[in-house]
């Protein structure tokens, strides 16, 4: 009652890519995948990524403070946003506050609008931070025997990968068996049986060295029984196949409608 729907779907322009500053200025209706591809064309990475990249908009990402698949390395959406332009309910336009990565002048007002879902104002434009485009991506799907082993495996990978760990996507057994079951197009990368499986990805700059070290690290994890099995992607097609299993969750959940939630828990509060 008394609500309106405001669409920014025609505000799709990528207004500027500043190579020197490593920033991109976009309108809120810009599609995430288009932003990623534009960044890559200039040798950069826009690190926010999620399964709905082909339809998700930057304005939606900002309004919900989307996390995505690479939070463990790059942080949430708010960590990728340097400035926003906002329109208030009375039509007042709050202009963007610059695009410097280091800015300690006064209040950083953008943060009250990021994750605000439009309740305080509508984000119409944003300056995004870009990163160096990785030259290598190593990807594996592993089985983990217990939650204790899972937490230790995370710590082990974070240290052994020396800052290159970009994704650590945990799936409980019931989800894994569902998403790779007979009604889906996906085949299970590792056998069923363990309570957890994990999709692990690293990003680096030295392809041969990174892949070799990645395989060594997984070998150590197997030897110390942090994991029980692992399948390593050998090429982009195999990496995409693994990520498709993770990204297909929303499509498959349409087969069994339910209320979905995006919640965060401390690791010590989980089992």
Give a label for each model feature.
Residues 1-271:
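Noncatalytic alpha-helical scaffold of FAD-dependent oxidoreductases
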